[in-house]
């Protein structure tokens, strides 16, 4: 289910006055939930110098992943490990970036399917995102970007206007001219089972630190807080939750990267939005051991976050060298 990459789905309308049916968004009880943001991609550098067990994920698999799978999560043992991790966390909401879209399997030659999720794949099979979260969830992805998706547990609510288990373009967004195709910032409204609604924004900022990359990210931050392309900010509901991979570190890079500084224009204790995830130079890095680029932001929800291997009491969930990001798990409440 989808629409063209610049069209606005009527079923996901958010009024330009900044309130997505504001009267209906006041919940009958304070909202509490567990949310996860996870960039499930990889890069060739992750396995450099690592001992690779026989039959494991090594340089040959990494080359195929890069050439055919967009370096997204498509290696079945890792899918299994990640699904087990999420089952243990038992989240209400998950947002993914760089997750392989199984609908691309027909484009992949047979000899590059062996050992990956496309081996034995058939149309109608669950997507990787659906496999990770399991039964009881709806999954929806960005307009023009099926590698960026959100999943909501039906016990929390359902995506507005999405009646299926999978709505391929269920998150509305627009392309930023000159910054690639498809929506890297996208919005969906969740109709809460307890009453009211929550506006969810999934962010995957453009990567790189050349001037054009930074400029793209500035414009993407503006999509979140100024205008998504339909006259309203992405975060334009009565209550908003913004999650994802910013591809910059506002706590470390604001003096160097204008896109990091732009986040601080809108997010802080003296701003309309606040950081739920920790920021700052003393925060243990969750990306490649060097930075914190995966974040959670809200205007009404507060809470605490943790990440495997960097937060005390939370060990690794896989022994396979693949991910350069760690998942961020946040317990939130109003």
Predicted feature locations:
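Surface-exposed patches in mature extracellular/periplasmic domains of secreted proteins
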Residues: 93-98, 136-144, 236-237, 277-279
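C-terminal motif of bacterial Sec signal peptides marking the signal peptidase cleavage site
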Residues: 1-2
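Extracellular/periplasmic catalytic domains that process cell-envelope and extracellular macromolecules
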Residues: 28-30, 86-88, 131-134, 143-144, ...
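Surface-exposed intrinsically disordered loops and tails
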Residues: 48-74, 102-130, 158-179, 211, ...
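Structured beta-strand-rich core segments of catalytic domains in phosphoester-bond hydrolases
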Residues: 40, 99-199, 203-205, 304-311
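Active-site beta-strand/loop signature of hydrolases that rely on acidic residues for catalysis
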Residues: 34-40, 78-113, 151, 188, ...
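N-terminal, active-site-proximal structural segment of metallo-dependent hydrolase catalytic domains
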Residues: 6-19, 23-131, 198, 218-221
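Metal-dependent phosphoester-hydrolase catalytic domains
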Residues: 228-241, 248-334
């Amino acid at each position: 289910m989808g629409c063209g990459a610049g069209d606005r789905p009527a079923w996901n309308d958010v009024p330009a006055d900044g309130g997505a049916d504001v009267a209906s968004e006041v919940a009958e009880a304070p909202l509490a939930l567990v949310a996860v943001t996870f960039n499930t991609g990889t890069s060739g550098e992750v396995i450099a110098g690592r001992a690779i067990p026989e039959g494991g994920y090594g340089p040959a698999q990494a080359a195929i992943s890069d050439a055919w799978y967009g370096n997204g999560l498509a290696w079945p043992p890792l899918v299994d490990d990640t699904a087990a991790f999420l089952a243990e966390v038992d989240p209400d909401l998950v947002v993914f970036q760089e997750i392989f879209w199984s609908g691309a399997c027909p484009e992949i030659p047979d000899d590059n399917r062996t050992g990956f999720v496309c081996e034995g794949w058939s149309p109608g099979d669950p997507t990787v995102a659906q496999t990770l979260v399991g039964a009881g969830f709806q999954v929806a992805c960005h307009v023009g970007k099926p590698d960026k998706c959100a999943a909501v547990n039906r016990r929390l609510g359902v995506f507005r206007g999405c009646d299926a288990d999978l709505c391929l373009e269920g998150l509305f967004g627009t392309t930023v001219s000159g910054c690639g195709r498809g929506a890297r910032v996208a919005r969906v409204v969740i109709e809460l089972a307890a009453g009211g609604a929550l506006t969810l924004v999934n962010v995957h900022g453009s990567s790189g630190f050349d001037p054009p990359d930074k400029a793209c990210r500035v414009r993407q931050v503006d999509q979140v807080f100024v205008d998504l392309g339909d006259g309203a900010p992405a975060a334009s509901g009565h209550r908003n939750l913004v999650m994802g991979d910013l591809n910059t570190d506002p706590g470390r890079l604001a003096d160097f990267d204008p896109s990091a500084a732009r986040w601080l224009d809108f997010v802080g204790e003296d701003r309309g939005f606040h950081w739920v995830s920790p920021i700052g130079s003393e925060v243990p890095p969750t990306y490649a051991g060097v930075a914190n680029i995966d974040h959670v932001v809200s205007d009404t929800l507060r809470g605490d976050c943790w990440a495997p291997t960097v937060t005390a009491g939370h060990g690794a969930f896989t022994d396979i060298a693949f991910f350069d990001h760690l998942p961020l798990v946040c317990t939130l409440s109003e």
